[in-house]
Structure formats: C-alpha cells, structure tokens
A protein has these predicted regions:
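Non-heme di-metal
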Residues: 1-168
Length: 168
C-alpha cells in the first residue's frame, strides 16, 4: 500500500511543527534563568509564531490543485521514514514539547534539545521537499527549510555562548 503527499499537507505539517516549537520555547522561556538564554527563547518563540502565520499564508495561496497528491510512494518508504522521524524526534503535540522543555536539567540542555528539534525539522522538510512536485509547491518548502536553518544558527550561537560562560 502506497501513500501520496501534497504541498497542502506539507504546509499543514509545517504549521503543526511551528505551533509545537512555539510551545517548547514558551515553556523553556518560563524555566530559563539567565537573561541571554531568556532572550533567545523569547525570540525563537516569536519567530515560531511568525513562521506559523507565514506558512498559513503560503498554504492559503497554494493553487487548489496542490491539495491533490503530488507524488506516489508505492512502497511507503518515504512515509515510513517521515513517520519514524516524527515519532522518535519531533514533537507530536504541544504538550510533548512542553514536557521536554520541563525535563531539561539546565539552560544548555534546553538549548541542545531545541537544536536537535530544529535539525530534525529540517530533515523532515527536506524529505517532504524531495517528494513534492516542483510545480506544486517545492520552492515554498525551501522557504520553510531556510527559516529553520536560521533557528539552528541562532541556537548554536546561544549554546556556544552559554557553555563559554559556564566554563569560566
């Protein structure tokens, strides 16, 4: 049994991932102690909010035919990969995101969890991009990947900064 994906589904998933990322950053912000890390989480939380709105707008602008399947996956390999990624690494719900943030032992651990989430989000969207037809929204998926890449850079800098302060 195969599965097909549409550009519309990519944007729906993007919106869900951004919403869950916002929940993670909101909880991490509430638990953060240092002003610098609080600023990072606050900024990322706001960016997730903006990305959600951006992706919602992009989804609404998709031509009607992008809600139709754009690629067949007869062996369900891509589906199985994406399903495994979501179940093992990405937050399935906002509640799971908040629980992970609450479980972090310190700010650096919370930042590292955020970094893992953002990297996995990029992998997820790169796979979705690979199976979405160019004429039906692939370039729009690239926008999602670019936004998430900026998150990785921001979090990586924050980790380096926080670790530098902790080693002094």
């Amino acid at each position: 049994m195969g599965i097909s994906f549409s550009a519309d589904e990519v944007f729906e998933m993007a919106m869900d991932i951004e919403k869950n990322g916002e929940a993670y950053y909101r909880k991490a912000l509430a638990l953060a102690k240092s002003a610098g890390v609080k600023a990072v989480f606050s900024d990322l939380m706001e960016q997730e909010r903006m990305h959600y709105a951006t992706f919602k707008g992009l989804r609404e602008k998709l031509p009607p035919r992008t809600s139709l399947p754009t690629v067949a996956d007869p062996e369900s390999e891509e589906y199985l990969y994406l399903d495994a990624l979501v179940k093992s690494r990405l937050f399935s719900t906002a509640r799971e995101a908040e629980a992970l943030a609450a479980k972090a032992g310190d700010e650096i651990e919370a930042l590292k969890s955020a970094l893992t989430f953002e990297k996995d989000t990029i992998l997820f969207f790169q796979t979705m991009k690979a199976i979405t037809d160019e004429r039906l929204g692939r370039s729009e998926v690239d926008r999602i990947i670019e936004e998430e890449h900026r998150h990785v850079v921001r979090i990586s800098k924050a980790i380096k900064e926080a670790e530098g302060k902790g080693s002094r």
